[in-house]
């Protein structure tokens, strides 16, 4: 079953959840703030996604900005970035939709249609 990981107060997450419901796609819901992704999960999702690791960061979030990660990330290794992401779910871009052979980061409807319909 599809894993849907989001922050319920996030409007983009709300749109994605509505889209899943309207398209009758079953999913397992997980609140990223109360159940932070583990280092192991993040590593697996990163490898499965084929995306640059920076795409997993919530660059518009307050925590990202207050930690000045825009200037720090270029000097960090993948291992350091994954460990940092695992410290707080609010650093992670959301929503995440995780299937057997794919990971969708953020809600871009065209990408979701391609993978989920």
Label each PLM-derived region with a short phrase.
Residues 34-117:
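Thiol/selenol-based redox catalytic cores and closely related redox-interacting motifs
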Residues 1-23, 27-32:
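Local sequence-structure signature of Cys/Sec-based thiol-disulfide redox active-site neighborhoods
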